[in-house]
Amino acid sequence: MSVRAFYDDLAPRYHLVYEDWETSVARQGGALASLIAEHWGVNAHAVLDAALGIGTQALGLLARGFRVTGSDLSIGAVTRARREAVVRRLPLVSLVADFRALPVRSAAFDVVLLCDNSLPHLDSEADIQEALAECLRCVRRGGGCLISMRDYESPPPTGTVEVRPYGERLWAGRRYHLRQVWTWRGPRYDLSFEITPVDGAEAGG
């Protein structure tokens, strides 16, 4: 399954990754606003969220008065983010794009975000360099990129399977168990994201 297809499929349920998504939106908005003010000043308000997802970071910043444009490879995720912004009456500008080729003009933003471990989805160091160069193209002089990534340890032997449980979530009146399963192949791993109703009915993942 491609990265785009994976996140298209996950978009309706992506909020279940968080124990309380609404609380996380507000908390991340506050944390990012503080980091932006600290590193780029209190007048840095034009933000490009180049890994928008369902809007976890963008919605929090919009609620704090930032001007946010969001882009993502997944049309399903962008559609969900647009809907969440409308519900909250927040002016999200959004588009579908690969962050290695962003259809925005150069030096248009104070800050570009790449959050929620988006950068490691790329296959090679060359792809990562291309993505970083493209994000830097989009920021004004004196601006910058803000990236959040998982703090990976050294990879285990090939074939190692790691199970990372998220616990139980309540959604639409039903309870679900969530977990990630990582199957390591050298320095990379195949990911399975499993969302299973407690009653055992089919849920996808």
Regions found by a protein language model. Give the residues of each.
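SAM-dependent methyltransferase
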Residues: 149-205
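Conserved beta-strand signature within the Rossmann-like core of class I S-adenosyl-L-methionine
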Residues: 142-149
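Class I SAM-dependent methyltransferase SAM/SAH-binding core
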Residues: 56-101
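A short acidic, Gly/Pro-enriched loop at the edge of an enzyme's catalytic core
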Residues: 103-111
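Conserved class I S-adenosyl-L-methionine
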Residues: 1-53
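A short SAM/SAH-binding and catalytic strip from SAM-dependent methyltransferases
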Residues: 110-126
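A short glycine-rich, Lys/Arg-flanked "PGG" loop and its adjoining helix->strand segment in the class I
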Residues: 129-141
